[in-house]
Curated annotation (Swiss-Prot):
PROSITE patterns: GNAT (PS51186). The chain crosses the membrane at residues 33-55, 60-82. Its EC number is 2.3.1.-. Residues 69-221 form the N-acetyltransferase domain. The keyword Nuclease does not apply. It is a multi-pass membrane protein. The gene is Nat8f2. GO terms for biological process: gastrulation. Probable acetyltransferase. Has no detectable histone acetyltransferase activity towards histone H3 or H4. One of its GO terms (molecular function) is N-acetyltransferase activity. This is N-acetyltransferase family 8 member 2.
Amino acid sequence: MAPYHIRQFQDRDHRRVLDLFSRGMEEHVPAAFYHVLTLPHSLLLFPGVPVTIILVSGSWLLATVYSFLFLLCLRLIFWVSCRNYVAKCLQADLADITKSYLNAHGSFWVAESGGQVVGIVAALPVKEPPSGRKQLQLFRLSVSSQHRGQGIAKALVRIVLQFARDQGYTDVVLVTGNMQYSAISLYQGMGFQKTGHYFVSIAKRLIGLSIFHFTYSLPSVWEPRM
């Protein structure tokens, strides 16, 4: 296990941060792809339609071509959707990390190992929190695939929690996709509670891709720890 340390983002990290974020998002495409294939209405199209083609026309070739094109188009849809989301992020908050986070009462941290950035996480204040709450939102958690299993993701989340405590926040909140199984397991294992879920569009509802909302409530300075 290679040693690592966590520090605040510096401008020289920018290219590596973008690459790490992009690769991390692309890793979710296969999970979403296989998830959709298991849905009941997907089974009508694959393998339902190929079987029907064989029964009606007797053509295995036509059924094979349909199956290939169906899988190719489905994979392409998810890939393009992912790339569009990444491009949107790269043109938004990740275009100028210092301005988006460090100069906006938040922060952006990187985990460094062997002189390379291998993990990232960010945090920003929630603009309109519930009445009586002061909330910090966790963003952009990602760890290089070659450096997972070393506790880096957990350490990055702890950095955000400590930052929130130091700044007097009452909660740390975050959103994540329901296909991000490892992230969900990490958050729940660290004490985050699922407080809601929603669909960003009708299309996402139809294919069962939802967004989970998690909250970690921080004890007040006067509240005794159990």
